[in-house]
């Protein structure tokens, strides 16, 4: 069975996107070699990417561009090479290479995907998908990057969660740019 993981950024005050729905705050202007190497290593690890429509549109508008290849060549290469799945009821088609569009019930489709042979699956962005799949107990790993920024308001990654999901910290790593990567796995479900 394939594992389903999440790799996402949050602010110190727990927001996934700012008050305008923007995530660019997580990508600081100053390059950080240690952080870039970590991100490139994650991207080169392979797998299949899973997005919701909004994240797909953001990613598809950036990673295939010359600017992405200039700024983060290893990550751009991996993002363009890796197979991708986008869940959307409103998109008519997808144009980014190696992308499959699914319109069915999210939890049902993800259960099917996890039971198919293939690489592990990683959700990037896609807060509503993360929330729904966490509620269903379908996420095996959460890799959360706490960024050294306070947004004051925005939306959390788990908006809409109806019941608690208890996690166990597996690993934590601090980077020179102030990011703290925390790896969690589900511990038990609370009623």
Residue ranges of predicted features:
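Portal/gating segments that form or line small-molecule/metal binding sites
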Residues: 1-138, 148-191
């Amino acid at each position: 069975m394939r594992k389903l993981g999440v790799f996402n950024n949050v602010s110190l005050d727990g927001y996934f996107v700012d008050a305008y729905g923007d995530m660019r705050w997580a990508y600081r202007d100053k390059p950080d070699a240690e952080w870039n190497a970590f991100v490139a290593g994650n991207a080169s690890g392979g797998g299949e990417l899973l997005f919701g429509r909004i994240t797909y549109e953001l990613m598809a508008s950036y990673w295939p561009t010359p600017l992405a290849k200039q700024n983060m060549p290893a990550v751009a290469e991996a993002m363009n090479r890796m197979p991708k799945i986008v869940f959307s009821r409103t998109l008519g088609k997808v144009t980014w290479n190696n992308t499959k569009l699914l319109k069915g019930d999210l939890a049902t489709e993800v259960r099917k995907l996890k039971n198919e042979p293939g690489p592990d699956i990683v959700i990037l962005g896609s807060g509503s998908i993360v929330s729904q799949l966490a509620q269903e107990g379908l996420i095996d790993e959460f890799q959360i990057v706490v960024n050294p920024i306070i947004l004051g308001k925005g939306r959390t990654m788990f908006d809409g969660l109806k019941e608690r999901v208890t996690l166990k910290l597996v690993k934590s790593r601090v980077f020179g740019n102030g990011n703290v990567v925390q790896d969690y796995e589900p511990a038990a479900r609370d009623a």
